[in-house]
Amino acid sequence: MNKLKQYECTVIIDGGLQDDAIAAAMELVKKTITDQGSVINNVLEVGRRKMAYLIGKSSVGYYAHIEFDAAPSAIAEIERVFRYEENILRFLIIQLSSPLLEMRKRVEKYSVMLGSPEDQAEPESESTAKS
C-alpha cells in the first residue's frame, strides 16, 4: 500500500447552478475523494464569487477548498472524474510539501500569539459611539 501524502484541492463549480445542484456537486467531489481511500481533513466552502474571466459562459463560480490525505496513485482517478464532470469548471490538486507545511505551522503559531487585528481593536465606549 502506498503511503498517504497530504494534498489540497481547489474546485470551481458553475455558480449559475441552483443551490441544490451545487450541494450535489460538492457531495460528488467529496465522494470521489473518499472513494479512492482518501481521508478528508478540512473543507472550506468559500461560496459564489465573480471570476476574473469567463469560463465557458459562466462569470460566477462557487469556490471550495479541500485538504485531504491520499495515496499518490489515487490522484489520477480523482482528476479523471473531475475532468468529465460538467458542473466542475476548474480544479487544481497540489501535493503539500514539507516547507509549505512548516510555514503554515509558523503562521498559525504567530497568529495565535499576536491575535487578529479585531482582537487588538479598542471597543468603542458608549459616549464615543453616540457622537
Swiss-Prot record:
Keyword rRNA-binding among UniProt keywords: yes
SUPFAM superfamilies, alphabetized: Ribosomal protein S6
Keywords from the named record: Ribonucleoprotein, Ribosomal protein, RNA-binding, rRNA-binding
Gene3D superfamilies for this protein: 3.30.70.60
Pfam families named in the record: Ribosomal_S6
GO MF annotation: an example: small ribosomal subunit rRNA binding
Gene Ontology annotations for the cellular component aspect, listed alphabetically: cytoplasm; ribonucleoprotein complex; ribosome
One of the GO BP terms on file: translation
Family classification: Belongs to the bacterial ribosomal protein bS6 family.
Protein name per UniProt: Small ribosomal subunit protein bS6
Taxonomic source organism: Chlorobaculum parvum (strain DSM 263 / NCIMB 8327)
Classification lineage: Bacteria, Pseudomonadati, Chlorobiota, Chlorobiia, Chlorobiales
The gene coding this protein: rpsF
